[in-house]
């Protein structure tokens, strides 16, 4: 039975989803959960893309102990130097260097010949080996590269010292048979691939990223790259939870499995969804709300008699459990801290204190506190560091024959207070117009979503907003038992992100 290694790129490729902006602290929290999930490698970012990215990579590198932390880099010395600086304190570090190899990229993007591409690839890997024991080389758009030339590049970079070679389907163009065959051909043409990791990286433009990844495993790949929930640029990446469950459930066929702690999948999926603002569809395989639901009477009858009649995966095997009551208003700080550890959080004492204070406020509003309530509450408090504005209060005058009017009171970072009021086309619109007046920011609301965290009239409401200002798109999230307050919190946080990132240089984007 082969063991397939898992390379997670949620923090790099996943963050390139439109509108997704994850703060450094949020990246660290996701990284620690990925470590708990058991991924072999995690790509913390693209250190040379921006100062913010370099800081995020460095922070993740400091905190993660049991997985290899990776930074992406172009085949450029300055990129590799910055990656080395960011990863200097990592327990286990690796560089992921990439260069396009396909005819269309050579002609229109690089303006380089085959010989020049080959020489640049070897030069980059050779330079990277000065810094890193473990170096991964990706042949960008490998799936559309001539197989003879691809084999030549793979052989050359292995000889130069690459310990992993990645064969990405950069634009999600391949079919499973075609993609698997690339790996079979490389194994046949380049014997030295037996000495290194052969990795696959699939995009989902035609909806075949997971199928292609599994085909690569059949063809000889020993590492699968992807993201949690399949998030990523355009249509996204291969969903790692689907790949892992497919290998585990059908190991009789694939004769391969991973070393992931599958019971951490649900928690990891929920954390990534909350912090990115990307809602998991109900019918999403493995982690969707309906993944284990049965509505058909025939199916229900079968499941009641014998679960395996219609369930090939048990919800408990991926970490879903009954939403039992866990804490209440009489629960103490110690019990609350133990619950946070049980739920996978890694918080400093100051952060525990802040979360506990918010928990006590919630207990006064809600009779029954569940795991999901605590997850939503703590995740919503993960905005750390100074914010330009904080919401102190929101009031609304509303009736079916009057124009909705909202007034908001915001506190600036320096402690000063600003109050504004506005009328709007509905309660939420009036709140947002009042916040615009108070902050002085001109933004466009691109998307607004509201979810119920749990059930019942006193359930927490979770609001996600997406705002745009010029070319900058950000997300904000708010949680409260009052959905209008949650809406205001989400909007203010998104405005803060815009103000924080407006002066930053535009990050370099990279699609492998």
UniProtKB/Swiss-Prot annotation:
Record GO cellular component, one term: cytoplasm
**Chain residue ranges for the region called Regulatory domain:** 390-512
Q: Which residues bind Mn(2+)?
A: 13, 201, 203, 237
This protein's pathway reads: Amino-acid biosynthesis; L-leucine biosynthesis; L-leucine from 3-methyl-2-oxobutanoate: step 1/4
Gene3D superfamilies named in the record: 1.10.238.260, 3.30.160.270, Aldolase class I
Q: Kindly report the protein's main subcellular placement as a broad class.
A: cytoplasm
Cofactor (UniProt): Mn(2+)
Q: Where in the cell is it found?
A: Cytoplasm
Q: Cite the Pyruvate carboxyltransferase domain residue spans from the record.
A: 4-266
Question: Its function?
Answer: Catalyzes the condensation of the acetyl group of acetyl-CoA with 3-methyl-2-oxobutanoate (2-ketoisovalerate) to form 3-carboxy-3-hydroxy-4-methylpentanoate (2-isopropylmalate).
How does the record describe its quaternary structure?
Homodimer.
Put simply, this protein is called: 2-isopropylmalate synthase
Species of origin:
Brevibacillus brevis (strain 47 / JCM 6285 / NBRC 100599)
Q: What is the lineage of its organism?
A: Bacteria, Bacillati, Bacillota, Bacilli, Bacillales
Give me the gene this protein comes from.
Answer: leuA
């Amino acid at each position: 039975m082969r063991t397939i290694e898992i390379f997670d790129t949620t923090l790099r490729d996943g963050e390139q989803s439109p509108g997704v902006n994850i703060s450094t602290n949020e990246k660290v929290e996701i990284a620690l959960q990925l470590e708990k999930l058991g991924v072999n490698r995690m790509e913390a970012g693209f250190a040379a893309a921006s100062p913010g990215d370099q800081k995020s990579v460095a922070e993740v590198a400091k905190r993660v102990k049991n997985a290899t932390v990776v930074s992406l880099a172009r085949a450029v010395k300055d990129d590799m130097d910055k990656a080395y600086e960011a990863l200097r304190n990592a327990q286990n570090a690796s560089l992921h260097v990439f260069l396009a190899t396909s005819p269309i990229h050579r002609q229109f993007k690089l303006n380089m010949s085959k010989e020049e591409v080959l020489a640049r690839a070897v030069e980059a890997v050779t330079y990277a080996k000065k810094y890193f024991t473990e170096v991964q080389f990706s042949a960008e758009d490998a799936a559309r590269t001539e197989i003879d030339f691809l084999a030549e590049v793979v052989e050359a970079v292995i000889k130069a010292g690459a310990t992993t070679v990645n064969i990405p389907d950069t634009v999600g163009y391949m079919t499973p048979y075609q993609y698997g065959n690339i790996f079979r051909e490389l194994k046949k043409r380049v014997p030295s691939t037996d000495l290194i990791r052969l990795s696959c990286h699939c995009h989902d433009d035609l909806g075949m990223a997971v199928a292609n990844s599994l085909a690569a495993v059949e063809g000889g790949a020993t590492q699968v790259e992807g993201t949690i929930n399949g998030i990523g640029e355009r249509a996204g990446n291969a969903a790692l939870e689907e790949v892992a469950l497919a290998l585990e459930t059908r190991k009789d066929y694939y004769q391969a499995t991973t070393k992931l702690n599958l019971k951490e999948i649900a928690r990891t999926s929920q954390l990534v969804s909350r912090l990115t603002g990307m809602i998991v569809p109900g019918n999403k395989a493995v982690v969707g709300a309906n993944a284990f639901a049965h509505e058909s009477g025939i199916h229900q009858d079968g499941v009641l008699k014998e679960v395996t009649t219609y369930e090939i995966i048990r919800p408990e095997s991926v970490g879903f459990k009954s939403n039992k009551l866990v804490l209440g208003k009489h629960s103490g700080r110690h019990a609350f801290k133990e619950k946070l550890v049980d739920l996978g959080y890694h918080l400093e004492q100051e952060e525990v204190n802040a979360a506990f204070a918010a928990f006590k406020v919630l207990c006064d509003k809600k009779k029954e506190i569940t795991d999901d309530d605590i997850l939503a509450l703590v995740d919503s408090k993960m905005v750390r560091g100074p914010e330009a504005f904080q919401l102190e209060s929101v009031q609304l005058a509303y009736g079916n024959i009057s124009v909705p009017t909202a007034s908001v009171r915001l506190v600036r970072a320096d402690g000063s207070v600003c109050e504004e009021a506005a009328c709007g086309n509905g309660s939420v619109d009036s709140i947002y117009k009042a916040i615009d007046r108070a902050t002085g920011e001109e933004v466009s609301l691109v998307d607004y979503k509201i979810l119920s965290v749990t059930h019942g009239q006193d359930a927490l409401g979770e609001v996600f907003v997406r705002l745009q200002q010029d070319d900058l798109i950000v997300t904000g999230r708010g949680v409260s038992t009052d959905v209008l307050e949650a809406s205001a919190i989400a909007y203010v946080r998104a405005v803060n992100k815009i103000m924080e990132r407006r002066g930053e240089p535009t990050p370099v984007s990279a699609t492998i």
